[in-house]
Amino acid sequence: MTQIINITQSKVISEQILRHVFRHRRLISDTEPCVHQPCSLCLAPHLEKVQYFVEHNEPIHFILPAFPAKSPNTQKVLGTMPDMGEQVSLKFLQSLCDQISEIYAPGAKLTICSDGRVFSDLVGVTDENVTLYGQIIQALLKEMKADAIDVFNLEDMYTDLSFDEMRQKLVKLYGQTIEAIKDAVKNNDHQCQMFNGIHRFLVEDYQVLEAHKSRNKIRLECKTRAYEVIQRSNAWSVLISELYPHSVRLSIHPQHYHSEKIGIHMIKTLDQWGTPWHNATVFDGKEFMLMKRSHLESMGATLVCQNGHPSYFAWTEQPLETRITVQEVI
């Protein structure tokens, strides 16, 4: 497509787009001035990619590895199906793309690179549940008319292999050695924080899945799994970067200020790591937020169903009409 604006104009527009996206950044730390006023180093890893699309008058393309499958830990989540947490998050992503079109007419597109198939066997999720979860995500996107969002997953890449063979091929072609990952975790603060976050999730889940085992044994086994999750997740990142070389990389994990990935908040959380697939959702009368299912039940929150399925919690003191009109909020 022919360029229609000059480089100076494209840089100004691209910076406006990035600063808008940065309003929703998920950061490792919130103590630096960059939290409120992103600096040139914050913009630098992404500016050229955004400019590529602006200079070609094309929608900005974001890629987001996310929406894998629900955690198998029913102390955290309501079940295996997407619920209000996923609905709110998908609507946020569509809204973000729509908002960008107010800054830049071609707008934005976003590809969810669903990574559930990549490491489901490591996190205690069956391939059947990954498939069901993905099908419902697609149905929600269609129901919402979320035309800016599409989904890519591992079976789109390797159509003629079993799920186990897909995972093996991914690691063989794109994976680092476990030794290299251990070295990175040992010597890089961000990699160490990532490992600790993944290890914590795994320990929480396997304490429920394998309650007959000691905590020490579970922690040790989950260390091995955490390294493999990182190995496959990194391999997935390399693959999608190869497929989408110009695209802007979003992440559901918190990132450093000047990272090559933009950590993104899709829904209110109590911590930096919360996601809809590791939590339940509660409506407080004004907005939705993520909390562990067990915490909400212990606090007396009321379960609300949609179409016969558990969807979210609401505080019991909220008037009934608030719950009835909850769809207006999202």
Curated annotation (Swiss-Prot):
Which InterPro entries does the annotation name?
Isocyanide_synthase_DIT1, PvcA
Keyword Lyase set for record: yes
Pfam families hit by this protein: DIT1_PvcA
Superkingdom to which the source organism belongs: Bacteria
**Origin species:** Fischerella ambigua (strain UTEX 1903)
Q: Which PANTHER family match?
A: SPORE WALL MATURATION PROTEIN DIT1
Top-tier EC class: lyase
User: What does the record's miscellaneous section state?
Assistant: AmbI1 and AmbI3 alone are sufficient to generate Z-3-(2-isocyanoethen)-indole from L-tryptophan and ribulose 5-phosphate, but AmbI2 and AmbI3 are not, suggesting that AmbI2 is functionally redundant in vitro.
GO terms for molecular function, please? lyase activity
- Family membership, please give it: Belongs to the isocyanide synthase family.
What is the role of the protein in this entry? Involved in the biosynthesis of ambiguines, a family of hapalindole-type alkaloids. Responsible for the synthesis of the isonitrile group on tryptophan using ribulose 5-phosphate as the source of the carbon atom.
Full protein name: L-tryptophan isonitrile synthase AmbI2
What keywords tag this UniProt record?
Answer: Lyase
List the gene name. Answer: ambI2
Q: What reaction does this enzyme carry out catalytically?
A: D-ribulose 5-phosphate + L-tryptophan = (2S)-3-(1H-indol-3-yl)-2-isocyanopropanoate + hydroxyacetone + formaldehyde + phosphate + H2O + H(+)
EC nos:
4.1.99.25
Keyword Lyase found: yes
